[in-house]
Amino acid sequence: MTVEYAEAEPKREEVDALPGPTLLEFGSPWCGHCRRAQPLIAEALSAHASVRHIKVADASGKRLGRSFKVKLWPTLVFLRDGKETAKLVRPGSADEIKRALAQIDG
């Protein structure tokens, strides 16, 4: 099952208050890099059921993406209790994502 990118983005204060491990994925449904990354992200997340995965549709002027300094898609931001621990831009392998997930879910 593919989760769609949410057009309505959460506020930064809400994200900062999220408990536990969270993966914020910034992208767009029409982005080729984003589509190619989906199987890699799904594979990496399969071993991390406790990680909250939030997909946010990003565009210029979107405040949440700018607050995380997102410039290219997909950008994956890994959070533990609302604090950024890692960021991946256009990940090239599931292993790369798994290493970042291990930092927040362990």
Residue ranges of model-derived segments:
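The canonical Cys-X-X-Cys-His
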Residues: 31-34, 76
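Structural micro-motif
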Residues: 68-77
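Structural signal for short hydrophobic segments within the conserved structured cores
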Residues: 3, 54, 85-88
